Amino acid sequence: MAQRLEAKGGKGGNQWDDGADHENVTKIHVRGGLEGIQFIKFEYVKAGQTVVGPIHGVSGKGFTQTFEINHLNGEHVVSVKGCYDNISGVIQALQFETNQRSSEVMGYDDTGTKFTLEISGNKITGFHGSADANLKSLGAYFTPPPPIKQEYQGGTGGSPWDHGIYTGIRKVYVTFSPVSISHIKVDYDKDGKVETRQDGDMLGENRVQGQPNEFVVDYPYEYITSIEVTCDKVSGNTNRVRSLSFKTSKDRTSPTYGRKSERTFVFESKGRALVGLHGRCCWAIDALGAHFGAPPIPPPPPTEKLQGSGGDGGESWDDGAFDGVRKIYVGQGENGIASVKFVYDKNNQLVLGEEHGKHTLLGYEEFELDYPSEYITAVEGYYDKVFGSESSVIVMLKFKTNKRTSPPYGMDAGVSFILGKEGHKVVGFHGKASPELYQIGVTVAPITK
């Protein structure tokens, strides 16, 4: 089932949606004008047939750029980077990245508020957004790419074997003799359970017990991205696998198991993880190939609810824990902060939190984050006992991110406080309110890549 990422960009315009029921994106048309991107149009493939989508926007004076995706060669779009003008809300520039390359920057100007549409290990199968005379916003549908099988390389001796396709790999055991790789054993993950498969011969062609060498993967936080294999003839016989080494998503490289030879093959597929092995073997590993599939999705990091700061009045509220914070609304009143509400992200979906406190005629001030690259690291503020209040109220709030600091909302007075934890980011808020904001606290999670 496709996962929908909400559209990024300015407000307004007419909503449009190409849908998600395509196998791939095959061509992208972008027309730029003086105010930014005028229109965008996509071509897709569905059930093996080309589907030409409608124009989203209006064609005026300008120029059109196109980007073709070679889907027949396994190429697919994995992410979109763009920016939009804060005043007009018009998208100014777009750049599309596939599993093989990046497009040129399409449009006039790459300044403004930047955004990214991406779900790691997934491909884009459809787009949606809004437009009027120009393109105002752009969102996308993502699906996991189908597994691919890369044919084995090496010799033709022995019999074929195939471990099949799994969720991921936890550990690899490689046994080698002085002349070749003799045995491979893999601990695979299959929906949270370990399944072990092995092929080859521990004694090898020399009939001497070999010592298995282990390479442990920190699954599901790490996965194997590529295998380097060398092959050569052994004692005038058929080609056999002489050495192996592995690279992971954490930029780790295993030791080289065996002795490297001249003929080198690298199995990899950008944006995918190694999920299975196949090849040929008898007394040794004669040939080796690979299956690549979607990378594992690690579980969310553990969260910690930090004690709030402020007074004890009002009723308790707790938004819970999310993947991150996208936007903050702060409403001020006569005595201090009258109300707050937050927009969160959960599984790449917007979640609008409830209003905490009482909305005033002054309305809300907004602080929007460049999510997911930007996140809140700390909240600073003041609380004070004010006339007519049953307890101390929050009179000022300021939000620090990994990139910048928000303006102060309210006035510095009373007791200062800082909410946060080293190496963590804010993923939720809690506190006490009604009719004013009396207390605020945060829920944090470890910062991960």
Swiss-Prot record:
It comes from the Eukaryota. Belongs to the jacalin lectin family. The keyword DNA-binding does not apply. Keywords: Acetylation, Lectin, Repeat. Residues 1-20, 294-314 are annotated as: Disordered. Residues 2-144, 147-294, 303-446 form the Jacalin-type lectin domain. The gene is JAL20. The modification N-acetylalanine is found at residue 2. It holds the Pfam family Jacalin. InterPro entries: Jacalin-like_lectin_dom, Jacalin-like_lectin_dom_plant, Jacalin-like_lectin_dom_sf. Signal peptide: none annotated. GO terms for molecular function: carbohydrate binding. Disulfide bonds: none annotated. This is Jacalin-related lectin 20. GO terms for cellular component: plasmodesma.
